[in-house]
Amino acid sequence: IAWFGQTGTQSRLLYVASKPGAKAQPAGEVDFGKTLENVAVGEVSDFSFQTQRGDTITGYSILPYGYDPNKKFPLVVYYYGGCTPTSRLLEFFYPLQVLAGQGYGVLVLNPSGTIGFGQEFASRHVRAWGKRTADDIIEGVREFCRENTWIDSTKIGCMGASYGGFMTQYLLTQTDLFAAAISHAGISNIASYWGGGYLGYSYNEAAAMNSYPWNDPELYVEQSPLFMAERIKTPLLLMHGTADTNVPTNESQQMFTALKILGKDVTYIQINGANHVVTEFNKREQCRATIFAWFAKWLQDDATWWNAIYKPKNL
């Protein structure tokens, strides 16, 4: 039996077990442990808490580089939700260990609706895109800050993609907890996503079972961030691939337009030619640099990197 495996601190490695029950042994000539021996990797720890509803929500955290319990550090919160769990991987599109290396604490949560915790837990996403999941995340962040006094509670950022991008936008309509936010390929209007893109209808066939824009305004309007845009106060970065076949670009564009009309801090970055998942190396690096620069601007009060990538200009 052979498989690839990795952890939050160990890169991908091929493992082989000679028979069921046998201890797996690393295979191959590449020693990733040696490759990373001069790289500072943040300590990864489990985190869980009980919500006001009595549910146990799990996740994990990464300590920032240079961690000192007597100092203050900004925090970045990552989540997905919406029927997919967050993984504990070193190799990841959103390089959480790199963020830790830049001096951020990192908190990763698996809120209600995530698979892997039983059918009842997963089914909480059905016809309930917004509030319950958002409540889990907000409660989790507050509890994590209460338990970890090294966090600067005025410098907390959040980010997510796809449904996680929707959740970023929705969170900002519910709380002022965050000082900066990133929505990648996020959904702003559940009604317009319902019939758009390759997966809009098929995804909602399960996620909004027997609910449609004409018979469930509580879901399609009251849980869509676009219809609550005036509540958003947090600086928001919207990123979207121009060739996204899952979530059409208008989902970011209409939120950008709304927030611009409202005079809010919002930036929209298009990734030319990129699909829902950005696979081309140079474009992935563009996305990552944009993420790092955005958080540096708002959570570390240093706009140098951002201004180097995106020159200030008057329109």
Tell where the protein language model's regions lie, with residue ranges.
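Cap/lid segment of the alpha/beta-hydrolase catalytic domain
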Residues: G21-K23, V30-S162, M167, Y193-Y203
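Residue position within the beta-strands of beta-propeller blades
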Residues: A2-F4
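Glycine-centered loop/turn positions within well-structured domains
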Residues: R12, D55-I57, T245, H276
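Active-site-proximal cap/loop segments of hydrolase catalytic domains
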Residues: V108-L315
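Conserved beta-strand termini and adjacent loop/short-helix elements that scaffold enzyme active sites
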Residues: A27-V30, I271
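Structural motif
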Residues: T9-V16
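Short loop/turn positions at the edges of beta-strands in beta-sheet-rich folds
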Residues: G8, T51-R53, T175
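Short glycine-rich, flexible loops that bind phosphorylated cofactors or substrates
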Residues: Q10, P85-T86, I190, N246
